[in-house]
């Protein structure tokens, strides 16, 4: 399973603690409790750990948007899932934000993070929700606070953020029941069922339905959309993917085969251009051309010798910032060597999640860069405690259950073969079918330039090899400054929100 080490923001980590973070309460205007929904009274609690779950909480709020004040209803609660024998198999936690309008055709977007094993707090408090986590000066999770989100997607779509079983406050009914959900197809089926339940119970059949997923959540989005069509009779209008894993063979072969390395190189070069202050899309386009021509040919062919080897490795070193001797030693397959060798002697370690992000190396004496990631295991952990405080203090959902922001045990137990899959997971065929079967279906894929976990060039390669009839606006790639969670940069978040809005405005 080593090739999945960097699958998403959910790998190689334990459950996050639920300490309450400091926050502002400016977004609580109009946020008084309005009681519990009928669904919450029906589905609260349950056996074992599920007894810690309270009834659904419904609160009313307002937020300022570019179009003026927006009143909305927030629901924090759970859906019950049942097995074939009619026994309760799981409780699925969700957070819904619904504008108080009388328009029955307002879009609704179903949102989840990745992992497998990541909760939805990242996208909730990081990008789309009405409240957002602010980290102050720099990336310091010790000072996180909540503020109104000026770029909330609630301005143009209702939102339903879902935590898969084992993440957030979603739990299997039995302690050993997770295996019933922790597989590619089983996961997609359970998420599709939750979406179908929400649509039915909230009379959203007439609403255009979109899916937003990050990292493995992008892969999940394609699988869920197909299950919705085939098993639930629900046809999604589109998918938006943030830093998605689409083709595992390409995305995790950067140190194994030539094409994988070639699709990694532009992200490494993007980070070096950022460090030099010379980043432009035009400069990066030159790297992309080199990556799929001279670089790919050199790595795929016999080992270079003599002057040709020196010239080639020197060029790669200049593009990436790595010392030439390191590039030569690795014969151009440089991703894994990158994190510990970028600046020999400075004792820094670089993040795979954002190659521009580096911190002091906690183990400079070790040759390998494996271990905690500066970005993944750093400030972003504060999203967990921030969400616990948000749910308790503003949404009225109070529980002593641990909020699982990132669950490493799920990733380790995931069944990649589930549902007739292959050892290298792929969602490209699902996207082809979705685009072919629904002529109005829209796909937007968003990436950060300096993400080494899910390099943007992989998605470009996949889109370039889609059938000709889906080219253009129906399937598009958008790129932003930053890494895997590029939305932690306010300017990139604002730009992506504006781009995403065009999907919803399309006829």
Label the predicted regions.
Residues 483-492:
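Catalytic histidine-centered segment of alpha/beta-hydrolase-like enzymes
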Residues 204-216:
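Alpha/beta-hydrolase fold nucleophile elbow
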Residues 306-453:
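Alpha/beta-hydrolase fold catalytic core
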């Amino acid at each position: 399973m080593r090739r999945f080490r960097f699958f998403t923001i959910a790998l190689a980590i334990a459950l996050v603690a639920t300490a309450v973070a400091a926050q502002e309460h400016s977004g609580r205007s109009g946020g008084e409790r309005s009681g519990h929904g009928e669904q919450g009274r029906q589905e609260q609690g349950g056996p074992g750990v599920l007894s810690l779950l309270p009834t659904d909480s419904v609160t009313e709020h307002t937020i300022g948007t570019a179009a003026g004040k927006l009143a909305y209803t927030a629901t924090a609660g759970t859906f019950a899932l049942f097995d074939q024998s009619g026994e309760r198999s799981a409780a699925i936690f969700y957070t819904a934000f619904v504008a108080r309008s009388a328009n029955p055709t307002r879009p609704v977007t179903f949102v989840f993070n990745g992992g497998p094993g990541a909760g939805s707090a990242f996208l909730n408090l990081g990008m789309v929700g009405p409240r957002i986590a602010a980290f102050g000066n720099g990336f310091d999770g010790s000072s996180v606070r909540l503020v109104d989100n000026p770029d909330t997607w609630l301005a143009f779509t209702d939102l339903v953020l879902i935590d898969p079983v084992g993440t957030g406050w979603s739990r299997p009914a039995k302690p050993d029941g997770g295996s019933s959900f922790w597989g590619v197809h089983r996961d997609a089926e359970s998420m599709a069922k939750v979406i179908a339940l929400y649509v039915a119970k909230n009379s959203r059949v007439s609403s255009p339905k979109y899916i937003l997923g990050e990292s493995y959540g992008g892969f999940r989005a394609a699988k869920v959309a197909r299950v919705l069509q085939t098993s639930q009779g629900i046809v999604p209008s589109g998918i938006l993917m943030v830093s998605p894993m689409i083709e595992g063979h390409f995305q995790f072969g950067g140190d194994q085969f030539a094409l994988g390395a070639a699709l990694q190189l532009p992200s490494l070069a993007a980070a070096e251009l950022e460090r030099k202050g010379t980043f432009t899309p035009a400069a990066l386009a030159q790297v992309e051309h080199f990556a799929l021509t001279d670089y790919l040919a050199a790595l795929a062919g016999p080992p270079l010798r003599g002057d040709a080897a020196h010239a080639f490795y020197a060029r790669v070193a200049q593009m990436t910032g790595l010392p030439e001797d390191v590039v030569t030693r690795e014969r151009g397959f440089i991703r894994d060597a990158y994190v510990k060798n970028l600046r020999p002697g400075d004792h820094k370690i670089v993040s795979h999640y954002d190659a521009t992000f580096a911190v002091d190396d906690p183990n400079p004496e070790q040759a390998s860069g494996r271990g905690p990631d500066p970005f993944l295991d750093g400030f972003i952990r504060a999203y967990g405690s921030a969400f616990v405080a948000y749910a308790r203090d503003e949404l009225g959902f109070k529980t002593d259950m641990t909020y699982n922001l990132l669950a490493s045990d799920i990733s380790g137990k995931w069944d990649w073969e589930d549902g007739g899959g292959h050892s290298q997971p792929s969602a490209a065929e699902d996207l082809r079918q979705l685009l072919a079967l629904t002529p109005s279906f829209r796909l937007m894929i968003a990436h950060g330039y300096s993400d080494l976990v899910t390099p943007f060039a992989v998605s470009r390669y996949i889109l370039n090899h889609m059938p000709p009839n889906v080219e253009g606006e129906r399937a598009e790639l958008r790129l932003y400054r930053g890494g895997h969670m590029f939305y932690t940069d306010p300017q990139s978040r604002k730009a992506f929100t504006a781009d995403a809005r065009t999907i919803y405005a399309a006829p």
